[in-house]
Amino acid sequence: MSVSVVIPCYNVEDYIDECLDSVKLQGECVDKIFCVDNNSSDNTINVIEKWIENNPDQNITLFKETKPGACAARNKPIDLIQSEWIQFLDADDLLLEDKISLQIKGSHGSDIVYDSFIKRGTDNNEIVIIPNIDVALGIMESNLGNTCSNLWRTVAIKDIGGWDEKQTSSQEYDLLSRLYHQGNSFQRLDNCKTIIRERVSGQISQGNQKLIWENYTNLRVSFFKQVIQKQKDSSVIQKSLTIIFGATQILYKYNPDLAVKIYDTILKPNHFIPPVTTIKSRFYLLTYSILGYRFAERLRTILRKLKST
């Protein structure tokens, strides 16, 4: 079993050494490392070149990708990869010892291995994120592992054309939803062998909140139509509608017309009523039940503005 590691790099001079060291810890299962610099303006390239010089036993190649964004950087070497598996790894994240080998052993013929991970905040506090057992619901609620904690079968990634470089946010769940829709199989593990480190700034893919929430909500609506709506499990459908509703509430702040359109085309036809446990304000629930979503959100926006003044 062989694995290629793909690391997009953008202004990570303080992180990439430790990241590459964590890849080296994986041992012989890694047969190739691809570092892809994505327009770094710091000393990232020099640090990588120095690491290559100091680790002649590692099969590593440094590419440069001028198209901005993590998706373009991750796609750069895909056509060259002949390993059975791909480990995508952000340059500020870490793999703990045996992460990859344990996932290969536990893959059981699946196409995507999704796993728990440690999320380390900027204050160094850590929490463990455990993924959903239900794959479809995990995609809906953004809880199906992480780009770096998961392991991806190369042929599955190539068959769907890799990462969507037009997707400015929600990239990993766009990828996961396409893989699921294509009929690929998923295996859940709970090894927790990846550390995802938060950074205040400097990540490759960042954008404005309006676009982020438009992408997030549209992706879930599309997945609901293609997959969830066809399921017979009413609890999964209800949970998915609740997720879409929560997304529209945030989206309403940035794009009220789109939020209302999604309500009218998805939530209303399914006779959706917000669960009491998801709404803090009884007044909102009362307004919603009597006057509907549009008026309830408009009133909530007015009240929020009054509180902030």
Language-model segments: which ranges?
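Short, well-formed alpha-helical segments that are part of the catalytic scaffolds
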Residues: 12-25
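Cell-envelope/extracellular polymer assembly enzymes that use nucleotide-activated donors
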Residues: 2-4, 22, 32, 174
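A conserved acidic beta->alpha catalytic loop
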Residues: 22, 37-46, 67, 90
